[in-house]
Amino acid sequence: MSNKAWGGRFEVQPEEWVDDFNASITFDQTLIDQDIEGSIAHATMLANQGIISQQDSEQIIQGLKSIQHDYHQDQIQFSASLEDIHLNIEHELIKRIGDAGGKLHTGRSRNDQVATDMHLYTKKQVQDIIALIKSLQSVIVDIASNNVDTIMPGYTHLQRAQPISFAHHIMTYFWMLQRDQQRFEDSLKRIDINPLGAAALSGTTYPIDRHETTALLNFGSLYENSLDAVSDRDYIIETLHNISLTMVHLSRFAEEIIFWSTDEAKFITLSDAFSTGSSIMPQKKNPDMAELIRGKVGRTTGHLMSMLMTLKGLPLAYNKDMQEDKEGLFDAVHTIKGSLRIFEGMIQTMTINKERLNQTVKEDFSNATELADYLVTKNIPFRTAHEIVGKIVLECIQQGHYLLDVPLATYQQHHSSIDADIYDYLQPENCLKRRQSYGSTGQSSVIQQLDVAKQLLSQ
């Protein structure tokens, strides 16, 4: 007799190497808790509907709980010949409790069973990711709150552009992560749907109660169409997209951490606990954690592209191609959760070199726009002011000094309206004070921004 759940139809059994290719148990045992949770809800409902006896239901539930316990104690070894987590659990259940275990699959298919597992798993992981994003955001707010008055050069094209508050700069990533968090939150509406009871594709002739299993499994709603319930993995694609976009934001932040920690910048010093060294160069301290996060975005985006291509041409209902939805999602979830934890620890323990940052903006031309704006206050058209300042900057470069070093007489050679107050006007801290537009880098605006962020975190 075949040990396959579908063996009655077949005269020849697959060889072991074919079983290995077909099996998913090496990775889908990740779903054991979700599979057992779904099975307990199904067994409870079957008994309540009079489809199986209460005694059989109780035996099934106790058997499932014992399997779950023993699995987590490393006392169960699953078999590739049984293909997947569903059939391995069912086989073990029948071995433990006898014929009652064979009644569990009444009114259910592996098609709706695996869909239920994946919905439960994805929901839990998205909730975990949201919590990790919020935790990282909280650290960003703490760092920003302590650096409202720390000034640094802002960049465009990776060239110094205008002085900005370090707090304003780092809060940029708070808002990127806030949108990421919102995307995950919104996606829960499309993840938190119960497919259990859809069976293979057309529902079942048994008088099941899908509303009961929806409540037992704490789903927010249930699929209205049984074929849709088992056919799509759009919620996995959406989750992979949200993971990938969040990883893109972490990658951009990581790139800045890497640059800031260079000897050329020296804006920050990373903790030894989040750095590594070189096997040949004794002096090296490498930002490997940031580099790994920067690199892993390719991994998660690859999983997204893979899943899109897997679903692209599939006919409706279950196809074995859908087995490919798991490893990519599991790995992407593991990757982003690890990346968020590492990033939080990395920035929480880094040292911000405030003196270096404040000095840097006095050794560049990031206050050149301020000089142009100063001329505009003297009723000079901005385009004319831009031309004048460009010539002054060129002279400074040729002579090896900065705008604060230019003698007043030289300024007045370029335009007679420039007075001695220009030196206060060009001080970096005064450049920031004049930025009062909503969402700008001025102190009052940054403090207001932080207040909004703290309110969001408290919700």
From Swiss-Prot:
EC code: 4.3.2.1
One Pfam family this sequence matches: Lyase_1
UniProt cross-references to InterPro entries, sorted A to Z: Arg_succ_lyase_C, Argininosuccinate_lyase, Fumarase/histidase_N, Fumarate_lyase_CS, Fumarate_lyase_fam, Fumarate_lyase_N, L-Aspartase-like
Listed pathway(s): Amino-acid biosynthesis; L-arginine biosynthesis; L-arginine from L-ornithine and carbamoyl phosphate: step 3/3
Catalytic function, reaction form: 2-(N(omega)-L-arginino)succinate = fumarate + L-arginine
Protein's UniProt keywords contain rRNA processing: no
GO cellular component: cytosol
Keyword terms, alphabetized: Amino-acid biosynthesis, Arginine biosynthesis, Cytoplasm, Lyase
GO MF assignments: argininosuccinate lyase activity
Compartments, record wording: Cytoplasm
Enzyme category, top tier: lyase
Main location class: cytoplasm
Family: Belongs to the lyase 1 family. Argininosuccinate lyase subfamily.
Descriptive protein name: Argininosuccinate lyase
Organism: Staphylococcus aureus (strain bovine RF122 / ET3-1)
Name of the encoding gene: argH
